[in-house]
């Protein structure tokens, strides 16, 4: 006969095995967690905004990791088995806050050391510029400059690596947009939640297990153009939708924005080239449209302590048919000799 204590313990184990994110849920629910990574039963890593650290969580064995990965894939409406050994998906209603989580999993033998799980927490980005400045994510010398970029309706892209804080900065800047402007945001996954009274959000949808029902970001950018936007925003530019976004920004929709993966501002033109090619835009046309459509790049990165911060502001210049990023402010060096280029842009918009 089992006593009450043993019965309750067994029920807790069963609940952990069958609901939510299992033993990973406390990590996912913790304040500040952005990523939880499983590389082996005894190797669970967490990023809480200060870089990756190894957690104390341990799975019983490889089978336990595999079961969790397959259950999460099923909850996301995806398939994960030997015939389909990797999966991308999105989970909703995780944790007390009911937040969303982006799921990626790979099964062995493709993952040679065992099932790998990568979970990205998609908490709504709600902080404003003042909060980021107070937290040290934006240098006081740059905070006013960032606000001026928004007020002047300059089109901008936030660039940076994975988990650098691109969406957080973008949301904060959108929160500084005048309340009488209408913002239409297009996202692959719902992350942007700026504090703005007139915000419309469109979120893409993956095809179901039968391969139907997909709604792409590119399709939604085209829909956004029909919704009388003052500003069009693409949460993450990573495909052929760059063609439609640049076209929108070149047809009277000033102050548009988005994020793009790049290690530094200088890499953004080449990154946009590659994305434009996916949409059938050749190199010359891409550079021509990019020069006319986007004025400013804001680069975010982690400092040596792993903290996210605004690291660099650059303007785009076109020379001999090619767009180049020119740094006007750097977190370690302050304003550059080219800062006048940004001030000229701001003055021209103020007098328009």
UniProtKB/Swiss-Prot annotation:
Keyword Cytoplasm on entry: yes
InterPro entries: P-loop_NTPase (IPR027417), T2SS/T4SS_dom (IPR001482), T4SS_GSP_E_ATPase (IPR050921), TadA-like_ATPase (IPR022399)
GO CC field: cytoplasm
Phenotype on disruption: Not essential for growth.
Presence of keyword Lipid metabolism: no
Sorted UniProt keywords: ATP-binding, Conjugation, Cytoplasm, Nucleotide-binding, Transport
Record's signal peptide: none
Annotated family: Belongs to the GSP E family.
Name of this protein: Putative conjugal transfer protein Rv3659c
Source species of the chain: Mycobacterium tuberculosis (strain ATCC 25618 / H37Rv)
Organism classification: Bacteria, Bacillati, Actinomycetota, Actinomycetes, Mycobacteriales
């Amino acid at each position: 006969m089992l006593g009450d204590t043993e019965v309750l313990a067994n029920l807790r184990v069963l609940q952990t095995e069958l609901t939510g994110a299992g033993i990973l849920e406390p990590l996912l629910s913790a304040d500040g967690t952005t990523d939880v990574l499983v590389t082996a039963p005894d190797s669970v890593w967490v990023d809480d905004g200060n870089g990756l650290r190894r957690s104390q969580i341990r799975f019983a064995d490889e089978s336990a990791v595999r079961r969790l990965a397959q259950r999460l894939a099923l909850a996301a409406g995806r398939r994960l088995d030997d015939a389909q050994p990797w999966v991308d998906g999105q989970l909703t209603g995780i944790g007390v806050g009911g937040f969303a989580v982006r799921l990626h999993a790979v099964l062995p033998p493709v993952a040679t050391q065992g099932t790998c799980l990568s979970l990205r927490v998609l908490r709504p980005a709600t902080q404003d510029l003042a909060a980021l400045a107070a937290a040290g994510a934006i240098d006081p010398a740059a905070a006013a400059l960032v606000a001026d970029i928004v007020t002047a309706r300059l089109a901008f892209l936030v660039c940076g690596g994975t988990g650098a804080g691109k969406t957080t900065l973008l949301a904060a800047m959108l929160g500084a947009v005048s309340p009488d402007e209408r913002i239409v945001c297009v996202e692959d996954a719902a992350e942007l939640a700026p504090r703005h009274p007139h915000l419309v959000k469109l979120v893409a949808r993956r095809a179901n297990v039968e391969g139907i029902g997909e709604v792409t970001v590119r399709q939604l950018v085209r829909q956004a153009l029909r919704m009388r936007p003052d500003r069009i925003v693409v949460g993450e530019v990573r495909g052929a939708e760059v063609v439609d976004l640049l076209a929108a920004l070149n047809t009277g929709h000033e102050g548009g924005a988005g994020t793009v993966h790049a290690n530094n501002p200088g890499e953004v033109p080449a990154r946009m080239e590659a994305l434009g090619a996916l949409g059938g835009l050749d190199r010359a046309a891409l550079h021509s449209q990019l020069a006319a459509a986007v004025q400013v790049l804001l680069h975010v990165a982690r400092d040596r302590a792993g903290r996210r911060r605004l690291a660099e502001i650059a303007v785009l210049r076109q020379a001999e048919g090619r767009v180049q990023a020119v740094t006007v402010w750097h977190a370690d060096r302050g304003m550059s000799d080219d800062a006048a280029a940004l001030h000229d842009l701001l003055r021209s918009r103020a007098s328009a």
